[in-house]
Regions:
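A short, conserved alpha-helix in the catalytic core of glycosyltransferases
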Residues: 219, 225, 242-263
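N-proximal low-complexity "stem/linker" segments adjacent to membrane-targeting elements
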Residues: 1-32
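Active-site-proximal specificity loops/subdomain of glycosyltransferases
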Residues: 38-91, 105-118
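Long, compositionally biased intrinsically disordered regions
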Residues: 271, 283-347
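Acidic metal-phosphate-binding loop of nucleotide-sugar-dependent transferases
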Residues: 100-103
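Conserved catalytic core of nucleotide-sugar-dependent glycosyltransferases
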Residues: 60-66, 105-238
Length: 347
């Protein structure tokens, strides 16, 4: 069955208000909601308008059982199976979020794949702090002092000098097959920010969507993100990194490949509110250390590794091959990636 879009989340908790709201809005918009459980998820889990896959169902769900058995138990990357179940519905888009993110719009609609005359285009910027492009309604003095998880720490105090040569206001015809939205409340900042700053934050709606193009990099997460079917393979969450690294490292790989093939990434204003599940901030800090130390090196190495690639799948393998050689992922990551690609072919 063809769906306009499928919404994907994973959880270890009973059905939350956030997931119930997601399912309602997705259904009203003609989509389907899929939730992936784990060993800690209550065995009685059930919710109207949600297709739920327990751990037992995952291990028995042909044709993805091989991949399901390779994924570690009690691990966020079991969300990869949700993507595969979603792809099987043959949607145009996959929307992904988490069980502690409440969609704050009245309707949930996929973004535009093609650029629009109202978009704001940025290229050749280098690293971009997306939070610098919006005001903070409940703390205007914080503008310029907030940074997303995965943004290089050594660049936090650098002020981007806006210039006409770097910001394109004229219409550019480009496709943006990935779109990431801001999140109010407890947004995706790193543990250093959480340990030293105050939350919550409320962002002003962006006057226009931003599309970042070649030569510009901005980390994005798995909390409020749309993926077009043309780039579904790039949904792969690397398994052998920490929970706090996996989606950010994926974003480095995905945007490098997107821009290698002359596409862009759309960023849009706040459309969800996060009431964060319980975390150990010191534990988060420890998990995020690879990003604190190596974000620029990771991005540089990924970019250089894919220059001779001819297609997305080849570029993705080359990127993770380089990351494995440098020790940023473990030696079995390539086997997992190969099984992922084989599983996509079965959708």
């Amino acid at each position: 069955m063809n769906q306009s879009f499928v919404s994907i989340a994973t959880t270890i908790y009973p059905p939350s208000l956030q997931l119930k709201t997601l399912a309602t809005l997705t259904s009203k918009s003609g989509g389907k909601t899929i939730v992936v459980g784990d060993q800690k998820t209550p065995s009685s889990w059930h919710e109207t308008n949600i297709s739920f896959f327990s751990l037992q169902a995952q291990l028995a769900e042909d044709p993805f059982t091989d991949f399901a058995k390779m994924l570690p138990i009690n691990h966020y990357c079991r969300k990869n199976l949700g993507y595969l179940y979603g792809m099987r519905e043959n949607p145009e888009w996959i929307y992904e979020t988490d069980d502690d993110n409440l969609v704050s719009t009245e309707i949930l609609n996929p973004p535009s794949l093609s650029s629009k005359e109202t978009d704001h285009y940025i290229d050749n910027q280098g690293w971009l702090n997306i939070y610098d492009y919006t005001n903070i309604l409940n703390g205007p003095e914080l503008v310029g002092t907030v940074w997303p998880r995965g943004y290089p720490l050594e660049l936090i105090n650098d002020k981007f000098q806006k210039s006409d040569s770097r910001e394109k206001f004229d219409y550019i015809e480009i496709q943006a097959p990935i779109a990431n939205g801001l999140v109010d409340g407890d947004p995706d900042v790193d543990a250093i920010f959480r340990l030293t700053r105050s939350l919550p934050l409320q962002f002003e709606k962006l006057k226009r969507d931003l599309i970042i193009c070649g030569g510009t990099w901005a980390p994005f997460n798995s909390q409020n993100t749309w993926w077009h079917k043309s780039v579904f393979p790039l949904l792969y969450l690397p398994v052998t990194t920490s929970f706090r690294v996996t989606d950010i490292l994926r974003s480095y790989v995905a945007q490098s490949i997107i821009m290698k093939f002359d596409m862009g990434i759309r960023f849009f204003g706040p459309s969800a509110i996060q009431e964060r599940n319980e975390h150990s901030l010191i534990g988060d800090f420890e998990q995020e250390i690879p990003l604190y130390l190596n974000s620029q090196k990771m991005m540089s190495e990924i970019n250089s590794s894919i220059q001779t690639s001819d297609n997305i799948a080849q570029a993705q393998f080359m990127a993770y091959e380089r990351l494995e050689k440098l020790g940023f992922v473990e030696s079995n990551e390539l086997s997992l990636l190969n099984c992922w690609i084989e599983s996509i072919a079965k959708c």
